[in-house]
Amino acid sequence: MLEARDITFGYSKNMPIYQGFSLRIEPGERVALKAPSGFGKTTLCRMLSGYLQPAAGEILLDGQPLPRRGVCPVQMVWQHPETAVDPRMRMNATLAEAGVGDGTAKTVRDPSIEPEKAELLERLGIRDAWLTRFPHELSGGELQRFCIARALATKPRYVIADEMSTMLDALTQARIWHVLVEEVERSDAGLVFVSHSPALTARIATRVVELEG
């Protein structure tokens, strides 16, 4: 279970965004976070995935703090994928960070990429030609597919998706959400997501958490 236990956080000491806030997400749950813009949904996502530390309280996985080293069992997919990758690395090297290939792959079915992971890349629509490109040579939708593949390839216990498809066309949105939900269901992983689409939330969420008030 992923848990935020009595957390307090604020960018200003006098104006906490969260004070004594708690949330539990069970394995297999798909939880949508709902709140007005600027309320702190992204901040909560960053805390749940270990990128921010609360001023008080704890973020726990099965009762233990998130690991500070190695691959984190809670993976986050950001709204702006260009902020989540090294601009100096080709995409095959970016995938290799998650154990997908050896950093030199020129095709999705390269011998260095395990068949199961190659299948994931294909389902996300990642093309051979993209593997040797740098992030700035890809569109936002193309780059986001790599970020999702990198997160899922680590077989996380939980995935945190912060408005990951907001800037994508409808066809790409449908494809990546289908793959993401299929993967978390297959592994009984939990999913926490933020989306401003009521239709998407209704289709995917098993629970909606209202953060306001």
Language-model features: locations:
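A short, flexible loop at the N-terminus of ABC-type nucleotide-binding domains that lies
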Residues: 1-4, 8-20
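Conserved ABC transporter NBD signature motif
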Residues: 57-70
